[in-house]
């Protein structure tokens, strides 16, 4: 794709994100390549209202010091770190802003899916029930996933 095609592509899809709330994105301090990746996506999609939240690395950090009560047996340290990072972003949003809502992303999100939307952010937001508290948006991989069970068949 040459520069002109890239510009036309960008201008055709970036408008779909008009009205996007402030974006908080989770990123481990050591993952500078993911930080660069996210910052380049924000530039490409013309998203200026974003804040990086330094994440907890459950593989290296002892997150149990931040928790009360018993940690479930089937939760890994990495999952706890991810959960703690999300809670840190929510806390920052709650304590540091007067905004009504925000968006929280992990640093491996791929915003290219927006080009395939047949709606805008404002269209989507207008369809959320009036009494919502939290909305989870996710993209499910449509490819065949190989798990240990699938490999055994």
Locations of regions flagged by a protein language model:
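An acidic/histidine-cluster motif and surrounding catalytic segment
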Residues: 1-105, 109-148
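A short, hydrophobic C-terminal helix/tail in secreted or cell-surface proteins
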Residues: 149-153
């Amino acid at each position: 794709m040459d520069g002109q095609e890239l510009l036309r592509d960008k201008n055709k899809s970036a408008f779909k994100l008009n009205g996007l709330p402030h974006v908080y994105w989770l990123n481990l301090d050591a993952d500078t390549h993911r930080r660069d990746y996210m910052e380049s996506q924000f530039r490409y999609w013309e998203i200026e209202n974003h804040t990086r939240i330094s994440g907890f690395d459950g593989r290296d950090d002892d997150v149990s010091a931040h928790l009360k009560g018993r940690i479930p047996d089937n939760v890994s340290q990495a999952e706890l770190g991810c959960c703690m990072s999300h809670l840190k972003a929510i806390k920052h949003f709650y304590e540091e802003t007067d905004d009504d809502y925000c968006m929280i992303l992990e640093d491996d999100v791929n915003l290219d899916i927006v080009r395939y939307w047949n709606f805008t952010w404002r269209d989507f937001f207008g369809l959320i029930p009036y009494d919502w508290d939290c909305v989870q948006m996710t993209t499910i991989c449509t490819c065949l996933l190989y798990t240990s069970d699938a490999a055994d068949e």
